[in-house]
Design a protein with these regions (language model features):
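Alpha-helical interface subdomain recognition
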Residues: 1-89, 101-106, 113-118, 131-134, ...
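Short Ser/Thr-interspersed hydrophobic loop/turn segments at strand-loop and sheet-helix junctions
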Residues: 49, 73-77, 170, 186-191, ...
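Short glycine/proline-enriched turns and hinge-like loops at secondary-structure junctions
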Residues: 64-65, 133-135, 159-164, 177-180, ...
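Short Gly/Pro-enriched turn/cap motifs at secondary-structure boundaries
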Residues: 114, 129-132, 156-159, 173-175, ...
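A short, Trp-centered hydrophobic/proline-enriched beta-strand micro-motif
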Residues: 117-125
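Conserved hydrophobic/aromatic beta-strand scaffold that supports enzyme active sites
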Residues: 122, 138-140, 147, 165-169, ...
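Flexible, small-/acidic-enriched active-site or ligand-binding loops
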Residues: 136, 189-220
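A short core secondary-structure module
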Residues: 147, 151-195
Length: 379
């Protein structure tokens, strides 16, 4: 087995590392402070072909594989997890299901919008009473003539107040449980669509999270994604892929924090020598490095399996679980290594710690990942 990246993937990493250093890092702290969506950088990522990069070339994408997308998200998240989150949602949760389940007409219309058209995508599943138990959603879509009439609301929607295209899940038959859920492609300009509360969050301040509301929202019949009653299976399969994106984001956060820790501990002198020379510090940093290497192997393995068309549900859950928990542990320990300085905004590590927490929650909590893993072990 060859663990080395291909020449193409190495070039993608180099390109994204340079972009992150030049464009993302200089504004990361300000993005966090102002809670502003990094619009200019997202436009540049569209120009670079990163947004929607796995979309086939015939629809305006780069035709890249899931590993390439994971590498991009990882590199971006080393300096700004918000930017990594925006890309992960667009690529994995909006472009992906349209590519996989869309009709030829839907692909021809929406995929070019989500690539060369610079339209941002989002995924709308979570509701106030339907979080980990996504089957309990109350949003409804009733077929009336040539269109569906959608009513309800979704919460905690990443890209919520900037997105143009949403993959939305709604009940089309309440008597059938999960088999009564259907998926739709909804545009922000459809009559009856509106954006509700903008969430104020612990971290990911540059990632636009909002409630979206459907009040007699008119959705054309041809915007049904897949067939009626298949929405829940579409959502679960899409989340499998999305978890690879969050694993890559988590990995990037941990790697970014570790790099900050190495640099700081080499320069911080206490008791007559750099604190990097103390064995306790060395062991702590060694454990962080070990976790990053293991997390990278899991994440890349899941991405490669997805790209090869293999079953990857368990791999994605393991990658997401391991890297998210490692990111939280690493950033917490890095803040401790920085001491009082780590608690201030003079250094980025407190932001990294705040950003890391959500990775243990969204796209399935750590507890849900353990359920998925054990279920795929035949337990």
């Amino acid at each position: 087995m060859d663990f080395n990246l291909s020449r193409e993937h190495q070039l993608i990493r180099k390109m994204m590392a340079e972009f992150t250093e030049k464009e993302v890092k200089p504004i990361a702290a300000e993005t966090d402070r102002t809670c502003e969506y990094p619009r200019e950088n997202i436009e540049k990522l569209f120009d670079l072909g990163v947004m929607g990069m796995c979309v086939p070339k015939e629809y305006g994408g780069a035709g890249a594989d899931p590993l390439a997308s994971a590498i991009c998200i990882e590199e971006l998240s080393k300096q700004c997890a918000s930017t990594g989150d925006i890309v992960a949602t667009h690529n994995g949760l909006c472009c992906d299901p349209i590519m996989t389940y869309g009709t030829p007409e839907q692909k021809a219309k929406y995929l070019p919008m989500l690539t060369k058209g610079h339209h941002v995508g989002a995924f709308a599943l979570t509701e106030p009473n339907a979080g980990s138990d996504a089957s309990k959603g109350q949003t409804e879509a009733k077929l009336v003539g040539a269109h569906y009439v959608m009513n309800g609301s979704k919460i905690f929607i990443t890209n919520g107040y900037v997105a143009d295209v949403f993959v939305v899940f709604a009940m089309t038959d309440k008597t059938r449980g999960t088999k009564g859920i259907s998926a739709f492609i909804v545009e922000s300009g459809f009559p009856g669509f509106s954006v509700g509360k903008h969430e104020e969050k612990l971290g990911l301040h540059g990632s636009p999270t909002a409630e979206i509301v459907f009040q007699d929202c008119i959705v054309p019949k041809e915007n049904l994604l897949g067939v009626e009653g298949k929405g829940f299976s579409i959502a679960m399969a899409t989340l499998d892929g999305g978890r690879i994106g969050i694993a890559a984001q988590s990995l990037g956060i941990a790697e970014g924090a570790l790099a900050e820790a190495i640099n700081y501990t080499k320069g911080r002198v206490q008791f007559g020598k750099p604190i990097s020379k103390f064995q306790n510090t060395q062991f702590t940093l060694a454990d962080m490095e070990l976790g990053c290497e293991a997390g990278r192997l899991l994440t890349y393995q899941a991405a490669i399996a997805k790209g090869e068309g293999k079953r990857y549900t368990k791999l994605a859950a393991m990658a997401k679980l391991f890297t998210s928990e490692h990111a939280m542990k690493t950033t917490t320990k890095v803040v401790q290594l920085f001491g009082g300085y780590g608690y201030t905004k003079d250094y980025p590590v407190e932001r990294m710690m705040r950003d890391a927490k959500i990775t243990e929650i969204y796209e399935g909590t750590s507890e849900v990942q353990r359920i998925v893993i054990s279920a795929n072990m035949g337990l």
